[in-house]
Amino acid sequence: MAIYGIGTDIVQVSRVAAVMQRTNGRFAEKVLGPDELRVYHARHARSQARGLAFLATRFSVKEAFSKAIGLGMRWPMTWRALQTLNEPSGRPTCVASGELADWLAERGITSRVTLSDERDYAVSFVIAETPDTAD
């Protein structure tokens, strides 16, 4: 595999909390995909802090992914077109849908992601890869 691009992002959890308060919770619906939103609601129901940490990490991954593929938050990269889900082992994985999935497939781009959060911050790192074209 060849590296297509890398991206990293750090989010202050208190800023996400402030945006959630300012938007009466609509921020989560704006940025999370349907599977992410279900997990967010389940975690938030158990603990507001866990819900905010989940939202902050997923927001961070979307930002890092957009940097890794070189588009920023421009078409076809949209908030809800990329979800960070977990494999049964717990390993996070980026799952694209719609036009973003098509754009990535046309270029043979796959990704690897890592994310972490602490009380005050959420951080993520994404590597976008393409098949090695060397002979």
Swiss-Prot record:
Keyword Cytoplasm (UniProt): yes
Subcellular location: Cytoplasm
Single GO cellular component term: cytoplasm
GO biological process: fatty acid biosynthetic process
Gene Ontology terms, MF aspect: holo-[acyl-carrier-protein] synthase activity; magnesium ion binding
EC code(s) of this entry: 2.7.8.7
Extent of the signal sequence: none
Database matches in Pfam families: ACPS
Reactions it catalyzes: apo-[ACP] + CoA = holo-[ACP] + adenosine 3',5'-bisphosphate + H(+)
Binding site for Mg(2+): 9, 63
Cofactor: Mg(2+)
InterPro entries attached to this UniProt entry: 4-PPantetheinyl_Trfase_dom, 4-PPantetheinyl_Trfase_dom_sf, ACPS, Ppantetheine-prot_Trfase_dom
Keyword set, alphabetical order: Cytoplasm, Fatty acid biosynthesis, Fatty acid metabolism, Lipid biosynthesis, Lipid metabolism, Magnesium, Metal-binding, Transferase
Record function comment: Transfers the 4'-phosphopantetheine moiety from coenzyme A to a Ser of acyl-carrier-protein.
Recorded family membership: Belongs to the P-Pant transferase superfamily. AcpS family.
The protein's name: Holo-[acyl-carrier-protein] synthase
Organism of origin: Paraburkholderia phymatum (strain DSM 17167 / CIP 108236 / LMG 21445 / STM815)
Gene expressing this chain: acpS
